[in-house]
Amino acid sequence: MKNSINRDITVLGFSRVTRSIAAGMINVAFPYYILMTLHYGAFVIGLIYVSATVGTAIFGFFSGIATDVWGKRGTLIIASALLPVSAVIVYFSSSLWTIVPAAMIGGYSATGSLAGGGIGGAVQPIQSAVLAGLAPHEKRTRYFSFFTFLSGVTAAIGALFSKLFDVRDIFMVSAIISAAGVPGLWYLHVAEARGKIGKLKTKSTIGKFTLTGMLNGLSQGLIVPFLIPFFVLVYHVPKSLMSEYAFASGLLGSFAILGAPMLEKYFGFVKSIVVTRGIGTVLFVVFPLLRFLPVAVFIYIIGPALRVMALPIQQSELTKRVDNDEMGRALGINQVARLAASSTGTGLSGYLMDTALFEMPFFIYGVIMAANLYLYIKFFGTRKEELEEEIEVETEVK
């Protein structure tokens, strides 16, 4: 039994690695392809990211339902094939009429740092549901930490690999790499706790995570998709150098995530999020004001790490508080709320940056993150309250 679980985790991990390498390459190449090769402005790339975010939200929502009703394995295979298909489409096209749909099915929403699953697409909630089913309840944070670490490191390597190829060729290379991880998913052994479309028993918990996820997505959409374009438009950083910065940022974020289990042990769910994301928020608010490249690079490298450090704790906490046959829908609904809000932020930032108001998205980001952290405290409370609520939830689920 243990060997079977280890094999399944290895298969899932390999798929995660291939997707992350491809995502890391696309994360660097896509802004340069739109801004420098096709010569469109920040507003256009903002609209593409908005469209991609909406598409990812729609795919994610229906994937979450399919995961619970149809099954995890089949849904995961179909969703995993979307990224290589989208990369092939972009490679063979220079028209926005085909690039936008490709970005939508590939999830080029760039709503997270590389370590946090940027360009994850609709596959993210399904992968999380499968991993939660394979991992022991008490070790889920550790498993989520390791997988997020693995994703971040390989995405950072992918960002560095982007130096080796022409901007357009990166999409074909990414398609080949991401496709390599799809066939093995057929051999996954996943416990299928299939639910029915109906009333959610843990809707209150899902609602709280959905609201905090929505604000988190709005804040992400404001700045994360435009960090690389910011360096392109303000500092005129070449792709070869930007890929090194992206590699360093992704690598640091990945190693920071390994500290999540210890962070959870000493600070608990809420304080871990408030401390790490609070510090990161302050850094991003001052980021556009300094206009000094070394400091900007420093914040670009450590800021995303602080933002995603507590991510495995949040993922684990959500899966602990909902029924197994509602997990796919819970993760899907959470992603829909996050990405729908993110598309609003991305559209606004694209307009502001296109009119040279580079600082405004970061200021708005600070206000929204402050509200988000307040809601985490209000909804989930102190460490003592967390433990009491967890016991309550476990009793209800049993």
What are the functions of these language-model segments?
Residues T141-S162, A337-G345:
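Glycine-rich segments within core transmembrane alpha-helices of 12-TM secondary carriers
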Residues G74-I89, K271-V286, F363-G366:
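Structural signature of the two symmetry-related core transmembrane helices
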Residues V17, S86, W97-A122, V295-M309:
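Hydrophobic core of transmembrane alpha-helices in multi-pass small-molecule transporters
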Residues D169-W186, P361-K378:
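Symmetry-related core transmembrane helices of the 12-TM Major Facilitator Superfamily/SLC fold
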Residues L47-G64, F247-G259:
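Central cavity-lining transmembrane alpha-helices of secondary-active solute carriers
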Residues K2-A57, G207-A246:
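Helix-loop boundary and gating motifs at the non-cytosolic
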Residues F59-G71, A256-F269, M353-D354:
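Helix-to-loop junctions at the C-terminal end of transmembrane segments
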Residues A103-L150:
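Cytoplasmic helix-loop-helix junction between adjacent transmembrane helices
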